[in-house]
């Protein structure tokens, strides 16, 4: 499994953020796109220097860093800049790959967190390419999907309403995707055994091996 999708925020938390965004200043999303992807990006973003964006960054980071599955999957070292994006009917973002490096460091994992109620828009699915095919992801309000930044992905056209999301990038303690997945599987398996059978000397050895890897 090279991506994870789960519920991060409640509907109440999302609505609180959406209420904050009523007074936000929105700019052309192409300002933050690379030259090769700029023409295919049709959306708006909250100005990076705004206080509202900084407040949302803090809310999202605290929620992510306190979620056991996210910590296990990402082994996060740093959350880079967070963008708040609004895509209206007719907008989307053509196929692109995120930058491998940012001014604040390496970007190993990318994420999208849906703030809008799924009934507030149509279309706008996130499509991520794998080696053999593509995965089309539709997010409910408060759901987040995290995937390797090396994967080609696109936001399909929004056909009705407005899609408001947070997108961001994570630097992991492990750069290599295979290593991260192995650690995630080991941690998930060990915690599953602990929940099912309780603690044992053998399981302690598994946790010891995980810690020392």
Give the positions of each predicted feature.
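Non-heme Fe(II)/2-oxoglutarate
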Residues: 1-76, 81, 182-213
């Amino acid at each position: 499994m090279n991506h994870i999708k789960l519920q991060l925020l409640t509907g109440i938390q999302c609505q609180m953020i959406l209420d904050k965004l009523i007074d936000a200043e929105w700019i052309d999303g192409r300002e933050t796109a690379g030259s090769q992807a700029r023409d295919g990006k049709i959306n708006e973003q909250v100005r990076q220097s705004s206080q509202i964006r900084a407040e949302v960054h803090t809310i999202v980071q605290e929620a992510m860093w306190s979620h056991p599955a996210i910590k296990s999957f990402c082994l996060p070292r740093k959350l880079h800049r967070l963008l708040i994006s609004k895509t209206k009917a007719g907008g989307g973002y053509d196929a692109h790959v995120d930058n491998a490096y940012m001014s604040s460091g390496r970007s190993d994992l990318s994420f999208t967190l849906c703030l809008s109620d799924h009934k507030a828009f149509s279309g706008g699915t996130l499509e991520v390419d794998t080696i053999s095919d593509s995965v089309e992801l539709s997010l409910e309000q408060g759901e987040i999907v995290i995937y390797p930044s090396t994967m080609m992905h696109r936001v399909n056209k929004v056909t009705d309403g407005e899609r408001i999301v947070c997108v961001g990038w994570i630097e992991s303690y492990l750069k290599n995707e295979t290593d991260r997945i192995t650690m995630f599987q080991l941690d998930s398996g060990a915690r599953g055994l602990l929940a099912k059978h309780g603690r044992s000397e053998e399981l302690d050895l598994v946790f010891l091996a995980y810690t020392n890897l």
